[in-house]
Amino acid sequence: MSKKYCYLFTEGNANMRELLGGKGANLAEMTNIGLPVPQGFTITTEACTQYYEDGRQINDEIFAEIMEYVEKMEKITGKKFGDLHNPLLVSVRSGARASMPGMMDTILNLGLNEDVVNVIAEKSNNPRWAWDCYRRFIQMYSDVVMEVGKKYFEQLIDQMKEKKGVTLDVELTADDLKELAGQFKAEYKAKIGEEFPTDPKEQLMGAIKAVFRSWDNPRANVYRRDNDIPYSWGTAVNVQSMAFGNMGDDCGTGVAFTRNPATGEKKLMGEFLTNAQGEDVVAGVRTPMPIAEMAEKFPEAFKQFEDVCKILEDHYRDMQDMEFTVEHGKLYMLQTRNGKRTPAAALKIACDLVDEGMIDEKKAVAMIEPRSLDTLLHPQFDTEVLKKTPVIGKALPASPGAACGKIVFSAEDAKAWKERGEKVVLVRLETSPEDIEGMKASQGILTVRGGMTSHAAVVARGMGKCCVSGCGDIKMDEENKQFELAGKVYHEGDWLSIDGSTGNIYDGAVPTVDASIGGEFGRVMGWADKYRRLGVRTNADNPHDTAQAVKFGAEGIGLCRTEHMFFEADRIPAIREMICADTLEQREKALAKLEPMQQGDFEAMYIALEGRPMTVRFLDPPLHEFVPTEEADIELLAKDMGKSVAEIKNIIASLHEFNPMMGHRGCRLAVTFPEIAAMQTRAVIKAALNVNAAHPEWHIVPEIMIPLVGEVKELKYVKDVVVKTADEIISSVKSDMKYKVGTMIEIPRAALTADEIAKEADFFSFGTNDLTQMTFGFSRDDAGKFLGAYYDKKIYENDPFAKLDQVGVGKLVKMAATMGRESNPDIHLGICGEHGGDPASVEFCHKVGLDYVSCSPFRVPIARLAAAQAAIREET
């Protein structure tokens, strides 16, 4: 049997979203439950997919079926396309299975031409309405289908109003609108080079193709990438007979929500316009009245609408967003969908629906978008002020929150200005580990280069700092401490505001409001913890971030990057001394200075964790990241070391690597300098012993992680150093404290030989940042240069550094997990890359049976919710 590409509203239901899209499925469902819906049909998402497979053409089979359904629609309505006695007019709307802003706008009044206008003008005894419909249709069709900009038509309307001495569109007469329709058609011909189509079926096919085309427009592609909507889904098209809200004062149109979408309050909220068509409310051409006032104008229709709202909310068991029209006092429902809402409203609605007995806890957990929680945890801009503030630039929303401060161009200045009590925004070409102190001191970070997983983005997310990255429009002049953006030069000390949730950049200081986490947040998180199987830890390397993560529900630390501790101002001289040492004795002398500092850090972390586990990753980055680059710092180091500047410069030059990502780093440092691993082991073990002595009830078991292992013999060599050092210390104090030694799986070879490595490891932690780099063979710092082209050409749909590539990298993770468990059934498995806070990646980790995910502190609630949703989905 051949595939069916069209469905009448009477043939579908709410469960057919994949085929009919959200709008089509809900129109069918409203029809099924007996609500007043203008009838029509839906062209399926499969027809859209076929359109692209056929080289952006609607094939003969689909065309014939559309025409067949036009005839069915004509029979149902008793009206015909182009008929001069009873003409059929329709709206054409897009409708993907997930709501997608940026898709094609609606086309209303399709089916009109000069002959039909004259007929409906006479039949309705309302020529003004008829010509208003026609000029709207010409304008919409030209804009939406043929991409002739709205502005050309708006200019003609303004000229007509000026000529007639009126200020509002509604004051134009039938003759004015008829003249305007003629001008619109002339404008169409001038821009397109052909006459405006008069055949309703030609108009319909043009509109359907435009809907399909809009699935692949730049706005839609960006939205899909940001919201995990696959390109392969396609969009449906809804062809619906018109209900007219613009036939007179006993007509109108409106949009309403069954609950307040901003607060979640259980109260009907919406707007209504008399004598208007749908897009007038949305476009803000006229100021609508609150929905409550509709009761005075149309008491019967309003009473019916209130009943419909209750029916729909009870039916869908969620807050509904509805569009409706009143034609001569009669109500017609044009659309319903689960309404978009603020994160705070989402939590309140979920809890209220549970309390009202409408849904259970699992449904409440499942209905909240995990990533939306991000905005609840960070300061936000005052929305009222934001409406009046122009956007001067837009880049990648790398770490959420809002920040405003005075511009500084270096980490040193950021620190110095903060110490003076100033709020600053750090603006850099790109950030490096040396900038961490400056990033901490800043309200937010703005970079010219780098993507969502650049150094700035990753570190900012870990700190809970706002970050906007990759603003290539900035012309940077670091030397003179200034940059140019949107035609204006900004100097050090000028005020700037950035929004890490949208990527928007604003001139001046936009006031912020603190995030507030209500009681509903705690309730929903409690439910999430009840149903999830996957543990959630955090990536943290200081007590402040640790305490923050514990507050957000982290069950321990999955990644403590020890190198971040070395960048503190009081430690960097000692690490540089170690790097520049000529002998083992000199190195050990420098390491002896670092050891008590590291031990102190670990003790503070263990105290903040209150007995929760912590995985400490030994030194990972290449040594060149620690050496000075500024002349003054080089001279200072030479003086401290008793060496000449030339000698220090030679040492620095010798550390240069052509590909440091794959160079002398990770366990390779511990193999060449085992004394580093020994020092770090002493610091971890002594810290744990001290804290255990003070808090015996915590039973701390240190977890030591060796990074960048690719060969089991590497792990064995470094592990021997760790075990020898740890056992000596533990036995010297007659303790029976246990500890674990594990490794990161971040090199493909480690994943492929996981069975061998598991014999020497107590745990695996998948470092998916490096595993992604090495599997794809590109550096995450450089990938931004070409990934945009890959998205445009549909080679990749997502940034593999933000969303785990389940086909390639995921296969390695799954293989390593399976082989590791077969070889060592007691092995503990986790993931600690940035992917640990991405909901789709969390679901993958649940499916492959990992024990925990670890992510930055502010992503912990997201991971907890995503883990619960994965478990709930698996049950159903």
PLM ranges: what are they?
Residues 1-389, 422-425, 432-437, 443, ...:
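Nucleotide/phosphate-binding sheet-loop regions of phosphoryl- and nucleotidyl-transfer enzymes
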Residues 334-336, 491-539, 545:
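C-terminal domain-closing interface element
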Residues 358-442, 504-510, 521, 525-529, ...:
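Protease-associated
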